[in-house]
């Protein structure tokens, strides 16, 4: 039989105090909704239907082309949300997972186990439950002496005995699909909230003597539903621990994993060393034996093997093998650094390609440049690429030596093996093998300093 999935993502999330739909708030680099969608993939659903509502267009954009969508224009409860999927799923034979889009910590393994449990026990409905020493506020799972599920009782309706139950409802379920939609026709809004509850379906199945079961999560953290910023931070913390643990098991060294922030899609090779307060975001890839020191921040970038990045920022760029960057360097988007390049302290590179073995040791700006191999930038070199309206390109050939405190005004080209004298302002192309000097001639006026106030003779 087929599996189907319904993801509930229509809510506004008032307690988040945000214009962004709740399910689009991010945990470890991707939205909560994407986390749930990826985990749902473990059950290989034939159809996945996502119920949208508040700012539906934003939610649909995130999963465009990956799921079918239905709209819940009025948020009238979880049962009502599932009703919205009727045109797509009613009458199909199979098992349907119903899950909230604000549960980013649920794993694919747990959802697969839930489905298997449901099928193996021939249940018409199976509740995903968890156990906690502090069940206050959760619906409790009431079982009989044979451990069969009798009902779900909410906190406000629970007896003193029922309040002692530690098994709680996580809000995730599996149903026989055909029976689900038959039962939905019989639920109503006769409750304090005036809403249709999916839990009422469980009651209907019990009344008709059909088999209802419960599968208990091994890890309570997976049950977390995010309703406010506090829970969002908790989810981020748990996810970060999971991610860092995975990398450590796979051969990555962390000085302080609790103070290291790595997004879920980051890839890290063997023998990488990561110090505290390192952040790796987006689609970043780190090559083997690279060292990332305290304070390094890398976004959507590829760093090769054996690199050393010291307290620096790299954004949307590629860094080849053996490169050293920092401290206090900034590699801005659309830059590429060739093998063995050295970018030192207080150097900024923007939108530039730099050939292998090139060095910019300190206090340099390289913007909109095409730089060859074995180039040396002296301290204080500035490539001037912007005239207030347009940006221009500088081309620097191989084996060029740029003296300290030089200003290179684009558009300009420095030929192979050329040399720029220290303190020069370069406004014209420099031919290959030439020396360019663009500075005022030094004039010494003998004894002139004796006329000035600072001279000891005038004190």
Curated annotation (Swiss-Prot):
Start and end residues of each stretch annotated as Pyrophosphorylase: 1-229
Broad enzyme group: transferase
Region spans: Linker: 230-250
Cofactor(s) this protein requires: Mg(2+)
Name of a matching Pfam family: NTP_transferase
Catalytic activity: alpha-D-glucosamine 1-phosphate + acetyl-CoA = N-acetyl-alpha-D-glucosamine 1-phosphate + CoA + H(+); N-acetyl-alpha-D-glucosamine 1-phosphate + UTP + H(+) = UDP-N-acetyl-alpha-D-glucosamine + diphosphate
The protein's name: Bifunctional protein GlmU
Keyword Cell cycle: no
An example Gene Ontology molecular-function term: magnesium ion binding
Residues reported to bind acetyl-CoA: 379, 385-386, 404, 422, 439
Compartments it resides in: Cytoplasm
Active site feature: 362
InterPro entries membership: Bifunctional_GlmU, GlmU-like, GlmU_C_LbH, Hexapep, Hexapep_transf_CS, NTP_transferase_dom, Nucleotide-diphossugar_trans, Trimer_LpxA-like_sf
GO annotation, biological process: cell morphogenesis; cell wall organization; lipid A biosynthetic process; peptidoglycan biosynthetic process; regulation of cell shape; UDP-N-acetylglucosamine biosynthetic process
Pathway annotation from the record: Nucleotide-sugar biosynthesis; UDP-N-acetyl-alpha-D-glucosamine biosynthesis; N-acetyl-alpha-D-glucosamine 1-phosphate from alpha-D-glucosamine 6-phosphate (route II): step 2/2; Nucleotide-sugar biosynthesis; UDP-N-acetyl-alpha-D-glucosamine biosynthesis; UDP-N-acetyl-alpha-D-glucosamine from N-acetyl-alpha-D-glucosamine 1-phosphate: step 1/1; Bacterial outer membrane biogenesis; LPS lipid A biosynthesis
Classification of source organism: Bacteria, Bacillati, Bacillota, Bacilli, Lactobacillales
């Amino acid at each position: 039989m087929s599996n189907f999935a319904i993801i509930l993502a229509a809510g506004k999330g008032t307690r988040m105090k945000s214009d962004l739909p709740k399910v689009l708030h991010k945990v470890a680099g991707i939205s909560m909704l994407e986390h749930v969608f990826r985990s749902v993939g473990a059950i290989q659903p034939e159809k996945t239907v996502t119920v949208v509502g508040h700012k539906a267009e934003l939610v649909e954009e995130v999963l465009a082309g990956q799921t079918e969508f239905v709209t819940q224009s009025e948020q009238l409860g979880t049962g009502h949300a599932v009703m919205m999927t009727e045109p797509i799923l009613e009458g199909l034979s199979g098992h349907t997972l119903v899950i909230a889009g604000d549960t980013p910590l649920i794993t694919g393994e747990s959802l697969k186990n839930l489905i298997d449990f449901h099928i193996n026990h021939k249940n018409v409905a199976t509740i995903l439950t968890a156990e906690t020493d502090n069940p206050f506020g959760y619906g409790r799972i009431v079982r009989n002496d044979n451990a069969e599920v009798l009902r779900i009782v909410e906190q406000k309706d629970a007896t003193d005995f029922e309040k002692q139950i530690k098994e709680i409802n996580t809000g995730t379920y599996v149903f026989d699909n055909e029976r689900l939609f038959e039962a939905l026709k019989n639920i109503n809004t006769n409750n304090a909230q005036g809403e249709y509850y999916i839990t009422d379906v469980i009651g209907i199945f019990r009344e008709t003597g059909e088999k209802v079961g419960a599968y208990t999560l091994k890890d309570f953290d997976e049950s977390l539903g995010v309703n406010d910023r506090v829970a969002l931070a908790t989810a981020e913390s748990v996810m970060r621990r999971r991610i860092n643990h995975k990398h450590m098991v796979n051969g990555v060294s962390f000085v302080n994993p609790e103070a290291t922030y790595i997004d879920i899609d980051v890839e890290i090779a063997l023998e990488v060393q990561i110090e505290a307060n390192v952040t790796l975001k987006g689609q970043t890839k780190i090559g083997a034996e690279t060292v990332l020191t305290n304070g390094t921040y890398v976004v959507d970038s590829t760093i090769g093997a054996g690199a050393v990045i010291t307290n620096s920022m790299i954004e949307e760029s590629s860094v080849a093998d053996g490169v050293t960057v920092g401290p206090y360097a900034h590699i801005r988007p659309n830059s590429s650094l060739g093998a063995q390049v050295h970018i030192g302290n207080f150097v900024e590179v923007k939108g530039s390609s730099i050939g292998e073995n090139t060095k910019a040791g300190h206090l340099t700006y390289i913007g909109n440049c095409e730089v060859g191999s074995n180039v040396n930038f002296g301290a204080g070199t500035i490539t001037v690429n912007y005239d207030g309206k347009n940006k221009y390109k500088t081309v620097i050939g191989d084996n060029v030596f740029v003296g300290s405190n030089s200003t290179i005004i684009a558009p300009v080209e420095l030929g192979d093996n050329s040399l720029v004298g220290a303190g020069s302002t370069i406004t014209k192309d420099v031919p290959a093998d030439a020396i360019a000097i663009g500075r005022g001639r030094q004039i010494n006026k003998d004894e002139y300093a004796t006329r000035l106030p600072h001279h000891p003779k005038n004190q």
